[in-house]
From Swiss-Prot:
An example Gene Ontology biological process: gluconeogenesis
Gene: fbp
Gene source species: Burkholderia cenocepacia (strain ATCC BAA-245 / DSM 16553 / LMG 16656 / NCTC 13227 / J2315 / CF5610)
GO molecular-function terms, A-Z: fructose 1,6-bisphosphate 1-phosphatase activity; magnesium ion binding
Cofactor, how bound (note): Binds 2 magnesium ions per subunit.
Cellular component terms (Gene Ontology): cytosol
PANTHER family, per database record: FRUCTOSE-1,6-BISPHOSPHATASE-RELATED, SEDOHEPTULOSE-1,7-BISPHOSPHATASE, CHLOROPLASTIC
Descriptive protein name: Fructose-1,6-bisphosphatase class 1
Amino acid sequence: MSIARRTTLSKFLIEQQRETNNLPADLRLLIEVVARACKAISYNVSKGALGEALGTAGSENVQGEVQKKLDILSNEILLDANEWGGNLAAMASEEMETFFPIPANYPRGEYLLVFDPLDGSSNIDVNVSIGTIFSVLRCPDGKQATEESFLQPGTQQVAAGYAVYGPQTVFVLTTGNGVNCFTLDREVGSWVLTQSNMQIPADTREYAINASNARHWYDPVKRYVDELNAGKDGPRGDNFNMRWIASMVADVHRILNRGGIFMYPADKRTPDRPGKLRLMYEANPMSFIVEQAGGAATTGTQRIMEVQPTGLHQRVPVFLGSKNEVERVTGYHDEAK
């Protein structure tokens, strides 16, 4: 691809704005700011030990998880990049207990930004792919946000995306009109369109789940995974391979490219906690992307994007990816009711 013929993220968004007329200018600018922040995060991640940002920060987030130094730095990068642009009413993050209203000395906009600044951060110190996940909603109260303003089902998202910081840095985006992938050209500092209208195959031979938790799974998940593991001699009559990176962005990106099902179910260890992944800034944006790519995403009993949130840090079980596999495991949950 010659440099002259490359489609950058900025050009792509402007063309979308012109052609479909459903991408408001403020939303386009917001996406570009988030993408620039992801470039900055990528730079800090790539420095590794040379940047003195590895290791823990000696603090915990609202989830009770030990924060890595890069968790905090990535959160600050996203806040600093987005607070002054005039496109947002407020932001919310995995790393903050409450939402972050745009300071009064900056102009406010009509959008809400929700993000996991560094997903898979347990992999930071061992140099495994990690990433950033984000979701954009409209503020129902205009430009004056409250916590309740954020509590919208995923069907109300106007944009969602993620960045993966791996061998290449990629930025995957949907605005409700398909899924596209951009790769960071570090030499010129721009995001270049490298995959258009991504589609997840309906059938798959790969699945992603943390099998070390198998003894804690509920029966529908046990049944489904046991069938996969039985291979050609089992009821599925085919061999399946398990893949698990322990980084949602990396696992989902693989599925987006070659099919598969990602599962993070609820289990018996914490019956009062429905799953581990957070609805607002992990499950919803990934579900939006997966559905736009022809896949499916459920909690096992309900379409994820139809779940009505009750809190910023609400957790849900997650089954997403190739449509036929998600429908199968969801059907097993229905049968078990």
